[in-house]
A protein has these predicted regions:
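Acidic, surface-exposed loops and disordered segments
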Residues: 1-193
């Protein structure tokens, strides 16, 4: 089992940060994040998520018009904002990712199945992204408040990728955090049958 310190880093002491320290993250850290999360499970090893790392001011300015007002400051101030999206043609890689069967045939021409599979598994991969980021010492701020159509048009004009959510990553400013909000107790959220 992981140590209590590691569990604190990933879960119990981790927070979603909206304010950031003026400290850059490195491309090596970004590489570490992906090289951890890629090993986490997806159905049929389909791996449909795609990650666009926005670090430069020019790229952030391309993102800004798509952001809801409440997310502008926390996104623009983050050392890096990541677009978690899915590849609408993820099945093209299945001959490599899932070589034990003709998995591609299960998706070709089946738009709803492609969309449902891609959204579900990319959301999982987005959660793995958060845990991987925390494991390399970074803080996160996942956000939904943005215009997906506008963002997709700006960053993915060919329509192949579709955004799910964005996430600021960096070193959070703990002095700006509110007191942690409560969570549901086991009996309120779970049952054993």
């Amino acid at each position: 089992m992981l140590s209590n310190k590691n569990l604190d880093t990933l879960f119990t002491k981790a927070r979603s940060h909206k304010a950031w320290l003026n400290k850059d993250i490195t491309n090596h850290q970004i590489d570490q994040i992906y090289n951890l999360l890629k090993f986490a499970p997806t159905s049929g090893n389909c791996c449909p998520a795609r990650f666009t790392f926005i670090k430069t001011n020019d790229s952030k300015n391309r993102l800004k018009p798509a952001l809801d007002k409440g997310n502008i400051e926390q996104a623009m101030d983050a050392p890096c904002v990541v677009i978690i999206s899915y590849d609408t043609e993820f099945y093209e890689s299945l001959s490599i990712l899932s070589p034990h069967s003709d998995a591609k045939a299960n998706f070709v021409g089946k738009e709803n199945k492609v969309k449902n599979t891609a959204e579900f598994n990319s959301t999982l991969q987005g959660a793995y992204f958060i845990m991987a980021s925390r494991s390399v010492g970074l803080d996160c701020c996942p956000m939904l408040g943005f215009n997906k159509e506008m963002l997709n048009k700006e960053f993915f004009p060919d329509g192949k990728y579709k955004s799910l959510f964005i996430c600021g990553i960096g070193y959070g400013d703990s002095s700006k955090l509110y007191e942690r909000a409560p969570r549901l107790d086991f009996i309120e959220a779970c049952c054993i049958v």
